Regions:
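Aromatic-lined carbohydrate-binding/catalytic grooves of carbohydrate-active enzymes
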Residues: 2-159
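Alpha-helix-loop-beta-strand connector modules within alpha/beta enzyme cores
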Residues: 70, 74, 172-181
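Charged helix-capping and loop-helix junction motifs
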Residues: 165-171
């Protein structure tokens, strides 16, 4: 069972040790049912802040020490932890925010992304690939060590950062897999070859039916045991 522990807007609603407490409670109430917990807003000031600085562990929610404690103690309760990141946008507070990586429209204006807090600006993912993206994953691994299970890459696949096609996605997934982490993604159709979990496929009531997942019976027959990528049996479809 997947669920989310979210921090947002500098409010620290779910500090790392509170998330651990929740894991213990759910383990008790479900008689040891396994858990997949996505930490949404693990860094900077919470969700959708500080993007591209993956190793910036949120201080308000416990910092690196508490995060490592969560990772270590969650194992006892059958919980697999992942983090929610973005490889398509950046924000002014990130130390990796710079003019060269920002994507522009044909008229020279910036290509803007999400804007519910600071205004996000889309990046040029090809430039990012060639200028330090892998090193940022490695920095995160150095801080956390072993034990993190997966990386969920938000919005990748919609093209807002340029080429999000098959080759670019394979490279991104390999960078993540190299650190010992599974690769997960948002769209039901996104990263089918590499991703083991797609949000829109698994969240039955979220989004429209055209993005709900992979409906190939042949592909599912071959790979059903490897991933959660398939269109759900949900009557509204």
């Amino acid at each position: 069972a997947y669920r989310i522990a979210m921090n947002f807007g500098s409010q620290a609603q779910n500090p790392f040790l509170m998330t651990l407490d929740g894991i213990k409670k759910i383990n008790l109430h479900t008689d040891g049912l396994g858990q997949g917990v996505l930490l949404k807003g693990y860094g900077s000031e919470g969700h959708d802040s500080g993007h591209l600085n993956y190793a910036d562990i949120g201080k308000r929610i416990g910092g690196v020490e508490d995060f490592k404690t969560l990772i270590e103690k969650a194992k006892k309760y059958g919980a697999h932890l992942g983090i929610h990141v973005n490889a398509s946008e950046t924000y002014p507070e990130s130390k990796y925010f710079n003019e060269k990586i920002l994507r522009k429209n044909p008229d020279g204006s910036y290509s803007y992304g999400w804007n519910w807090l600071d205004q996000g600006i889309n990046i040029d993912t090809a430039y990012d690939l060639a200028h330090g993206r892998l090193a940022r994953w490695e920095d995160l691994k150095k801080k956390l060590g072993e034990g993190l299970d997966f990386i969920y890459v938000d919005v990748w696949g919609n093209g807002q950062s340029g080429d999000n096609g098959a080759w670019a996605t394979h490279v991104l997934a390999k960078e993540i897999n190299k650190q010992g982490w599974r690769f997960a993604i948002e769209w039901g159709h996104g990263g089918e070859y590499d991703s083991t979990f797609q949000h829109w496929a698994a969240d039955l009531t979220y989004g429209g039916y055209t993005n709900k997942g992979i409906n190939s019976a042949i592909t599912r027959f071959i790979r059903n045991h490897q991933k959660d990528s398939w269109v759900g049996d949900y009557r509204s479809y």
